[in-house]
Amino acid sequence: MCGIIGYTGSENVKDVLLDALELLEYRGYDSAGIAVKDETSHVTNVYKCAGRVSDLRAICDSKKILSTCGIGHTRWATHGGVTDQNAHPHQQGKVTLVHNGIIENYRELIADYDLQEILHSETDSEVAAALLNHYYKGDPKEAIKKTVSKLKGTFALVILFEDQPDVIYSIRNVSPIVATICKEGAMLASDLTALCRFTNEYFVVPEYHILELHKDHVVLTDLNDNVVEPEFLSVDWELNSAGKNGYPFYMEKEIMEQPEAIKNTIKDRIVNGLPDFTSDGVPDSLFTDCDRICVVACGTAMHAGLVAQALVKSIVHVQMDVELASEFMYSNPVIDEKTLVIAVSQSGETIDTLEALKYAKRQGAKCLSVINVKGSSIARESDYVLYTAAGPEIAVASTKAYTTQLSVFYLVVAKMALLRGVYTEEQTKSFIAELERVPEVMQKVLEKRRDIHVIAKKILEAKDLFMIGRGLDYSILLEGSLKLKEVSYIHSEAYASGELKHGPIALITTNTPVVATVTQEKLMSKELSNIKEVKSRGADIVLFIKEALSGDLDTEYQVIKLPDMQDEFMVLPASVALQLLAYYVSSDKGFDVDKPRNLAKVVTVE
């Protein structure tokens, strides 16, 4: 849950590192630091502080830093408080190091190597630096090999040695590292986002391989000193796609990018009006040979799975379960070779989802993943991958990753319905044609953003807010509620409307905001009755309703009419409306929308 960057080349390293760290802040932003090699003396100088990258930039701008080689880190505290001393990089003797992960046996290492007196921080990371310095006798690789043989846990280590000018070393276990070589030099990072300003080509550093970054080349070796050729991947992200492009926050930019992201996600998977995964290498048998499906995911990705579950069960009539990845292994799930396990993750690095996937494979399940980053850990662990085309998503609160995940699931539902004989070819084409309308309909929702902003202003002071809906509406409100609590810090809960009388209605008092969605015609009458019920208890109603269903509504409701689609697809335009609501509440409250307190985007520690 930390951000890492390393660079050696021809550019001013200070600017490269700080710019990259700003792009990596969503991985953690309670402290930041850089270490740079002085151009003449080759001494490694460290600049770090508790606080944001902007605080670090202010410190660095006050110094004369002349260097073209260095490493950087944004921290999300797991061991030790948020202090200058606990910020990375850590220095011990000739070693300067940044680390992502958790070293589980750090206390034992402190005792075994009598390190207590030389440590300056409370972190497990500095223990790794001290151990490296203990073993370093002039051969960096030998010191690295001896050190990692003693470590238990997860780690991505990026290292500078005092007497190795302009060279950066790295090794990892579980925690991700990607790297590249480009005309400006050689780079590595914990996330592809930090590299895409320079190149679209990169490679994933394999576990327990030592990477050397030199100014004009890289060397990758295994622990037996065999040279390994990096396997370069390409990504079609624009080189400037990780910027805000004039928007005040990444979240707003990413909401606005959704029509194009969905178009890019589905366009190459529709052939002659039918779903086609040939280009993904996914065989039809994957969807016909399974008796049941299990989605494993966390947070927003799990909510995408809940929508998929409702669609698969109602349309394809196949049993589908959705499991929290963090609980999956402990629940003794019923998994066998006839189970299709689908892992969903924006980053492809979510540690709980990765571990759940590994467990499912050990039980013999076929594994498909829906992710946004090529070459990520979950992609490499999966039998098959369906990539979304969301592009870089920087805001901690996910928006376009969620809706592109949904668009992939719609394709999967159509494919399964066709292959299993539930849909004829013509019915499948009709379903796909409606999916192709989604970008246009989403754009119409985005054009209503001023109306949604007006409603957002009316709930700024709310301490509690409830969301109610039935069927697919309930599934999307779980995500809408999560978005609101993530970025606005309003206590928000989503309930299935039929459960109101089983407890939640006791919380409704005068002026309690209640957000409802009505997009499913067959459930409309029951849902409107539930809305009237909470209205009679004094609730203030915000209603997002499919335009064709709007008819005669209570004039006291605050209503946003959503452009019409077939009921099964209303999830997508309604999701955008709920994202906008959360965004405007947060921005109007003056919060940092992109970096909600206590949250990091990529969870890489259990």
Can you annotate each of these PLM segments?
Residues 68-85, 271-284, 308-344, 491-507:
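Glycine-rich oxoanion-binding loops at beta->alpha junctions
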Residues 1-244, 248-249, 260-267, 271-291, ...:
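Conserved short alpha-helical segments that host acidic/polar catalytic motifs at enzyme active sites
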Residues 69, 95, 292-294, 340, ...:
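Structural motif
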